[in-house]
């Protein structure tokens, strides 16, 4: 089972620490968080991309994906006026360009909250318009775009497997895929494996965390309530061959290396010996 480190937890340290830790601790790849100060797409365009490419080479660490910050600060393609929407889409396009240049396997985005007063027809119309434009760009440059469903604490747009199916049906692009952060279905009493059943080969990536079942908090494996050992057995038996990013975000920023080590060790302990 291939593992990825998410760099968001290292945001108060130089990004080289994330590459170094991923290499030394034994992660198989790295998922780059696209927020300041590390890898904000406009900063990469201004020259920072050279450092990212150099670090990947120095530490021999594959960049499995690039995840620009699209959940509302300051970019959210689902909320605000046309100027705000246009800025968000332009940033995501730039992020795809930067992902292409750093040889990332995908660009991962989400449909953040569309606002409490926005009716469903407006939400889905805006999502379809956004994804159509982004997928056309992705097809033109040869970049896979992954749409991540969020928890209902974070969004009111794409939050479950059926929402993903709806989005994929609205924009049937060969470059559009989805994934599952296993916290999202768990807090909604939705079976994680239903994503595998419903999405098939459109399921491109996994974020592995533990969950308390009552919030969007991402815990290290073993700190929450999820039956992770049994879940990973099912995922392996289903034949999943992609990466599993152990997605530690802001909860563990005070000691990212220590928690990244602990998270990886606990995750691997969940797996059969031949998958570790």
Swiss-Prot record:
The known regulators of its activity are described as: Inhibited by Zn(2+).
InterPro entries from the UniProt entry: IolE/XylAMocC-like, Xyl_isomerase-like_sf, Xyl_isomerase-like_TIM-brl
One term of GO molecular function: metal ion binding
Q: How is the cofactor bound?
A: Can use Ni(2+) or Co(2+) in vitro, and, to a lesser extent, Fe(2+) or Mn(2+), but not Ca(2+) or Cu(2+).
The job of this chain, per UniProt, is described as: Allows E.coli to utilize psicoselysine for growth. Does not act on psicose or fructoselysine 6-phosphate.
User: What GO terms in the biological process aspect are recorded for it?
Assistant: amino sugar catabolic process
Q: Which residues bind a divalent metal cation?
A: 148, 181, 207, 247
How is this protein named in the record? Fructoselysine 3-epimerase
PANTHER family assigned: HYDROXYPYRUVATE ISOMERASE (PTHR12110), XYLOSE ISOMERASE-LIKE TIM BARREL DOMAIN-CONTAINING PROTEIN (PTHR12110:SF21)
Subunit: Homooctamer.
Q: Which family does it belong to?
A: Belongs to the FrlC family.
Q: According to the UniProt record, what class of enzyme is this?
A: isomerase
Give the originating organism: Escherichia coli (strain K12)
Entry keywords, A to Z: Cobalt, Isomerase, Metal-binding, Nickel
List the gene name.
Answer: frlC
